[in-house]
């Protein structure tokens, strides 16, 4: 599938403001700006495996489209939600378990880049990845 590859973060847009809105402290925000995040995505039918490798952690997340699961962000924020495939976009709809606020994510291939867009409490950010 189109998402299957290893992707390395190339640049970010408004990521610091997004993390600030999420409640991430300034020290962690500065570190996260240089996390060298790499995603290895594989899809088998409705099942996705995403291996995240960064300065902070290495984890593997396995999910099925439309099936609710729990996920922890690098700063420890706990989320619960689902991914769905709408056209050529992976749509993530999550709620924080601590306050119930929504975090929505879209992953899409634009040209030769993977663009991951986040929206939380009206603040939008993007992280743009290139194939590694």
Swiss-Prot record:
Changing residue 90 to G: Reduced stability. InterPro entries: Calycin, FABP2, Fatty_acid-bd, ILBP, Lipocln_cytosolic_FA-bd_dom. Changing residue 55 to A: May have a lower affinity for long-chain fatty acids, such as oleate and arachidonate, compared to T-55. Gene3D superfamilies: 2.40.128.20. Induction: By EGF. Changing residue 67 to G: Localized reduction in stability. Signal peptide: none annotated. Hexadecanoate binds at residues 83, 107. It is found in: Cytoplasm. Changing residue 123 to G: Reduced stability. FABPs are thought to play a role in the intracellular transport of long-chain fatty acids and their acyl-CoA esters. FABP2 is probably involved in triglyceride-rich lipoprotein synthesis. Binds saturated long-chain fatty acids with a high affinity, but binds with a lower affinity to unsaturated long-chain fatty acids. FABP2 may also help maintain energy homeostasis by functioning as a lipid sensor. Belongs to the calycin superfamily. Fatty-acid binding protein (FABP) family. This is Fatty acid-binding protein, intestinal. It comes from Homo sapiens (Human). The lineage of its organism: Eukaryota, Metazoa, Chordata, Craniata, Vertebrata. The gene is FABP2.
């Amino acid at each position: 599938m189109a998402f299957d590859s290893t992707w390395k973060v190339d640049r970010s847009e408004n990521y610091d403001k997004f993390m600030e809105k999420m409640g991430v402290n300034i020290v962690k925000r500065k570190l996260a700006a240089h996390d060298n995040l790499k995603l290895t995505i594989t899809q088998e039918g409705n099942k996705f495996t995403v291996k995240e490798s960064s300065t902070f952690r290495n984890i593997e997340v396995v999910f099925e489209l439309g099936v609710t699961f729990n996920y922890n962000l690098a700063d420890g924020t706990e989320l619960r939600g689902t991914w769905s495939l709408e056209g050529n976009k992976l749509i993530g709809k999550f709620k924080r378990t601590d306050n119930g606020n929504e975090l929505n994510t879209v992953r899409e291939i634009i040209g030769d880049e993977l663009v991951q867009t986040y929206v939380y409490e009206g603040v939008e950010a993007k992280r743009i990845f290139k194939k590694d």
